[in-house]
From Swiss-Prot:
GO terms for molecular function: rRNA binding; structural constituent of ribosome. NCBIfam families: L6_bact. Pfam families: Ribosomal_L6 (PF00347). HAMAP family: Ribosomal_uL6_B (MF_01365_B). Keywords: Ribonucleoprotein, Ribosomal protein, RNA-binding, rRNA-binding. This protein binds to the 23S rRNA, and is important in its secondary structure. It is located near the subunit interface in the base of the L7/L12 stalk, and near the tRNA binding site of the peptidyltransferase center. It comes from Aliivibrio fischeri (strain ATCC 700601 / ES114) (Vibrio fischeri). Part of the 50S ribosomal subunit. This is Large ribosomal subunit protein uL6. One of its GO terms (biological process) is cytoplasmic translation. Belongs to the universal ribosomal protein uL6 family.
Length: 177
């Protein structure tokens, strides 16, 4: 059995938490996040910690409590520090540039690709071959980065495409005659 739910989430200074039934709102320096948690979880705030527990008589209550704890912990980290994903474009002529609230990509297609950014997500291009996606919602930052990567995933022979900065692309050997 996982014991994730047994550890309380510590609320750092400068972060405000509001509980309204199963809805939790966390406000901090980087923004505000709201989430409705599963009914199988009992949430309570004690001083500067949030404690999670299972509701009696629910089969998978401990699993749901662990999931809720992980989600709330990510919300607290997000509004306090924020999350970042870095992407690298590798290939001849592959470029990225900001166009207002969208990322413009040149990825070898016959047309340029523009990806509009959702609210709460910021992106910047320090160089033409790098994209840095930042925001306070971990799930949304990861989803935007995955969407940008999906336009041209790294191919296995030369490794060309859009990749995460920490991603290792395994390359295959070309077919021999």
């Amino acid at each position: 059995m996982s014991r994730v739910a047994k550890a309380p989430v510590v609320i750092p200074a400068g972060v405000e938490v509001k509980l309204n039934g199963q809805e939790i709102t966390i406000k901090g320096g980087k923004g505000e996040l709201t989430r409705v948690l599963n009914d199988a979880v009992v949430i309570s705030q004690e001083d500067n910690t949030i404690v999670f527990g299972p509701r009696e008589g629910v089969t998978n209550a401990w699993a749901q409590a662990g999931t809720a704890r992980a989600l709330v912990n990510n919300m607290v980290i997000g509004v306090n520090e924020g999350f970042t994903k870095k992407l690298i474009l590798k290939g001849v002529g592959y470029r990225a540039a900001m166009k207002g609230n969208a990322v413009g990509l040149t990825l070898g297609f016959s047309h340029p690709v523009e990806h509009a950014l959702p609210e709460g997500i910021k992106a910047e291009c320090p160089t033409q071959t790098e994209i840095v996606v930042t925001g306070c919602d971990k799930q949304l930052v990861g989803q935007v980065a995955a969407d940008l990567r999906s336009y041209r995933q790294p191919e296995p022979y030369k490794g060309k495409g859009v990749r995460y900065a920490d991603e290792i692309v395994r390359t295959k050997e070309a077919k021999k005659k």
